[in-house]
């Protein structure tokens, strides 16, 4: 396995670790509605940071974006909006299926759809079937899916042992939402694929290869921001128990505390895709679809590890922790199989 591929896998791991931890600051926000908290974090992660970093990277910010036709920008934006819909469905999936089953089904579907649909769309799926390296990467995807399933099972055992249940368990509604979440969340993978002309244009302007994907985030995350912020603002305006004015009428120290923590959560959310871009840049072009598989499987891996570190599994008993550990090992094996396939 080459150093470039190893570093690509490493940066995807770092990005996934940030994704697994980003909600921790949000949990410490006090006396704010989820909608206000999510909006503040989202403005930081989907608008301020993508625009600020792109302005630093590009020699002429406006000239860069105006150089693309609507036919180039629109698919990137719409796939970003597609991801935004998946993001909202994610929370609803947890409500109706519970954390473990919801995450397992949604992540499993988005891992498959986001990874395999890209080469199908590009018309080069035959390369995966007809080459040794392609077949090995497909095997890695399958092993990763098995690892996600094992971690999901560990979560179910933990919830059963600790008496944790879904907020409003509804299998039929939850499965529909989980499938929708999985499909729509893959929009981020499709957006990165559609944004290749933007990456190439950034490279032509002298942007470092590690950073060429970052300017496209202005458009991708702009699409996601409209969906997420629109959802939050509509609820803040229509739901009687929610009030943006009330949330910002608290004592100033508490408002500062909440804004700071929400912004930190937004920063950590953005960093997952900052390092995703670094990892993506190190993956061989013919295997760039594997970035999504690495990100999602490492997200599950890091989520399990973070749960252990935060002692969320302390009262779960030995068996769930053993199953979780097995799932994490399987995901690590999957990453190595994929790495060897890309190096073949």
Swiss-Prot record:
Localisation: Cell inner membrane
Entry protein name: L-rhamnose-proton symporter
Gene Ontology CC terms: plasma membrane
Reactions catalysed: L-rhamnopyranose(in) + H(+)(in) = L-rhamnopyranose(out) + H(+)(out)
Function per UniProt: Uptake of L-rhamnose across the cytoplasmic membrane with the concomitant transport of protons into the cell (symport system).
Topology in membrane: Multi-pass membrane protein
Molecular function GO terms recorded: rhamnose transmembrane transporter activity; symporter activity
Leader peptide range in chain numbering: none
Keywords linked to the UniProt accession: Cell inner membrane, Cell membrane, Membrane, Sugar transport, Symport, Transmembrane, Transmembrane helix, Transport
Highest taxon of source: Bacteria
HAMAP family from the UniProt entry: RhaT (MF_01532)
Residue intervals passing through the bilayer: 4-24, 38-58, 68-88, 101-121, 137-157, 175-195, 214-234, 259-279, 290-310, 323-343
Family statement: Belongs to the L-rhamnose transporter (TC 2.A.7.6) family.
Cited InterPro entries: L-rhamnose-proton_sym_RhaT
Pfam annotation, one family: RhaT
Gene name of this polypeptide: rhaT
């Amino acid at each position: 396995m080459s150093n470039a591929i190893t570093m690509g896998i490493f940066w995807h791991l770092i990005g996934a670790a940030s994704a697994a931890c980003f909600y921790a600051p949000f949990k410490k926000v006090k006396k704010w509605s989820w909608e206000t908290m999510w909006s503040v974090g989202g403005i930081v992660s989907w608008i301020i940071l993508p625009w600020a970093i792109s302005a630093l990277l590009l020699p002429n910010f406006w000239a860069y974006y105006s150089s693309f036709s609507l036919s180039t920008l629109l698919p990137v934006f719409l796939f970003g909006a597609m991801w935004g819909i998946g993001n909202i469905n994610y929370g609803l999936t947890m409500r109706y299926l519970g954390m473990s089953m919801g995450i397992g089904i949604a992540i499993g579907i988005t891992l498959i759809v986001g990874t395999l649909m890209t080469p199908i769309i590009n018309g080069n799926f035959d390369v995966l079937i007809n080459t040794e390296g392609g077949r090995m990467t497909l095997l890695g995807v399958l092993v990763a899916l098995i690892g996600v399933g094992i971690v999901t099972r560990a979560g179910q055992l933990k919830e059963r042992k600790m008496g944790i249940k879904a907020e409003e368990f509804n299998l039929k509604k939850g499965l529909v939402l989980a499938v929708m979440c999985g499909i729509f969340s893959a929009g981020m993978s499709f957006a990165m694929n559609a944004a290749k002309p933007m990456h190439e244009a950034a490279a032509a302007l002298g942007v470092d290869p590690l950073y060429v994907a970052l300017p496209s985030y202005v458009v991708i995350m702009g699409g996601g921001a409209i969906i997420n912020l629109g959802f939050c603002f509509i609820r803040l305006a229509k739901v009687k128990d929610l009030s943006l004015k009330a949330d910002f009428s608290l004592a100033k120290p508490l408002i500062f505390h909440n804004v700071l923590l929400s912004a930190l959560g937004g920063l950590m959310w953005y960093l997952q895709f900052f390092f995703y871009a670094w990892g993506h840049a190190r993956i061989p072009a013919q295997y760039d679809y594997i970035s999504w598989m690495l990100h999602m499987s490492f997200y599950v891996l890091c989520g399990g590890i973070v749960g252990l570190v935060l002692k969320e599994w302390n009262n779960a008993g030995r068996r769930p922790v053993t199953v979780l550990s097995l799932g994490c090992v399987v995901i690590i094996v999957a990453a190595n199989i994929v790495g060897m396939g890309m190096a073949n």
